[in-house]
C-alpha cells in the first residue's frame, strides 16, 4: 500500500537499505551496512550507536514520566481516601 500512495504522490519512498537512517549518507553496494531493530540501516557503527543511545534516552524519559504519572495518580487516590466523610448516627453516653 505504501508504494501505491508514494507513487500516487509522484515520489517513490527510498528503500531502507539505500541510505543511512541517521546521516542519510548513501549506502554503496559493496559497503558494510550496520543494522538496528531489523529495519534501520546505518553507514557506520558510530551512526548506529548514536541511534541506540538516542532511543535509550527516549525510553528512560518515557519510563520516568510514566512513573511520575503513576505516583501522582496514587497520591491523589490516597489524599481522596483520607478525606472520607462518614455519615450515620452518633451515640454519646
UniProtKB/Swiss-Prot annotation:
Keyword terms: Cytoplasm, Metal-binding, Nucleus, Zinc, Zinc-finger
Gene Ontology cellular-component annotations: cytoplasm; cytosol; nucleus
GO biological process: one example: response to starvation
Biased composition, class Basic residues, residue ranges: 60-70
Zinc fingers, FLZ-type class: 15-59
Pfam families (alphabetical): zf-FLZ
Top-rank taxon, per record: Eukaryota
Matching InterPro entries: FLZ1/2/3, Zf-FLZ_dom
Database matches in PANTHER family: FCS-LIKE ZINC FINGER 1-RELATED, FCS-LIKE ZINC FINGER 3
Annotated function: May act as an adapter to facilitate the interaction of SnRK1 complex with effector proteins, conferring tissue- and stimulus-type specific differences in the SnRK1 regulation pathway.
Assembly: Interacts with KIN10 and KIN11 via its FLZ-type zinc finger domain. Interacts with KINB3 via its N-terminal part.
Protein name, as recorded: FCS-Like Zinc finger 3
Organism in which the protein naturally occurs: Arabidopsis thaliana
Amino acid at each position: 500500500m505504501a508504494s501505491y500512495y508514494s507513487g500516487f504522490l509522484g515520489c517513490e519512498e527510498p528503500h531502507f537499505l539505500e541510505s543511512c537512517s541517521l546521516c542519510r549518507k548513501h549506502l554503496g553496494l559493496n559497503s558494510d551496512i550496520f543494522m538496528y531493530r531489523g529495519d534501520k540501516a546505518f553507514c557506520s557503527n558510530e551512526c548506529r550507536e548514536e541511534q541506540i543511545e538516542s532511543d535509550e534516552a527516549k525510553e528512560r524519559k518515557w519510563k520516568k514520566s510514566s512513573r511520575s504519572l503513576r505516583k501522582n495518580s496514587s497520591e491523589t487516590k490516597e489524599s481522596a481516601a483520607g478525606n472520607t466523610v462518614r455519615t450515620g448516627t452518633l451515640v454519646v453516653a
